[in-house]
Amino acid sequence: MIRWDKRIKLLFLLPAVIWVLALTIAPLFFSLYLSFTDVKREVVITGVEEIPILDKEGNPKTRSDGSIRTKKVKQKELQIKYDWVGFKKYKRVVNDKEYQDAAKFTFIYVIISVFVEIVLGLFLAFLFNRRIYGRGFMRSLMILPIFATPFAIGFMFFTILFEVSGPLAWMGIPFLSNHNWAPFSVMLVDIWQWTPFCFLVFLAALQGIPDDLIEAATLATKSAYKIWTSVILPLLQPIIVLVILLRVAESAKLYDYIASLTKGGPGTATQSVSFLVFNKAFKMNDFGYASAGSFLMLIVVMIFVMLFFTRLRKTYE
């Protein structure tokens, strides 16, 4: 009976396992293989076929002797060849100035946007954790941006920041066409959408702190700053770490805002790694370069996560 129960549990897990293997693990290994190859797509003529020549009404044309007029059409087939090149693509990516600029922008983007989201999320959570009038309505209103798609929000901000006919055109600031302003415009969109997520998680964590603990801290000191830094923040540290990891992993995949706001411009000022490798793969057909660039970014994010957890473990020890 126990063995049968285990089989039933495994049977229920099987669809999820197949889903992960088919849509996550298999594409990941195939992408890794592509990063060591030079993918070439060639149109090969496989034969010649004679087909009838049709008139305007769709009927076959005939000769004077009654035979059907035909024409020869080449049969073509798209063939994909994978030439093994080893680490050639990785060397090319590392030495590519365009990739270096994209990685630099992505790194700065992640650091600034995640930092601002964490700080604003903590501040808003502390503010709305108090009993203030209209707290429930404002709380519901603030989380609405989370439910919108990033591309739709990017397009909405494009209409707002468009310096020719947008609502903010009167300011005369080139939000999207200036290489200094454009990166911060993209960061603004990310901060606007994902600060409510940080706020919601931190608010739930704050409400989980026992009131007795806060009252005991209040008796020990009247300073709200000391209570916040000595009691509340240490208790929130695991949640803050979790939110940072989630936001770093998500922000590093930056694509939607750029595709809907700046298209990577002006020039390459707002071109992220994801946007660059997408263009390399699907516009220039350089799948090896795109896969190598993606895996290098994945390695950097994994190293960051490992160092972060190592540092956190030492702190708790």
Language-model-detected regions and their locations in the chain:
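A structural signal for multi-pass alpha-helical bundles of membrane permease subunits
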Residues: 2-317
